[in-house]
């Protein structure tokens, strides 16, 4: 599990494989710039990342990119069995969007 902290009050606990899948999708679809690719490794190596503690412009770009990718992925996934890998992925994406809706 990784901890992605958006601010002092909001933290997204996400399975590492879900974060990797979303992050790679965001990179591949241009929702995250390639210059942000290192943050996937930073989060993986450190058990997460606190967006509060990094450069605000980088934190904003990561939040916007991951939210855009999550929204697109939810549309693509449609209705999936919650007991599958896609179901876990979908539930995690929905939680990301809920936690970061007003950032």
For each predicted feature, which ranges?
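Acidic (Asp/Glu-rich) sequence patches and key acidic residues
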Residues: 1-103
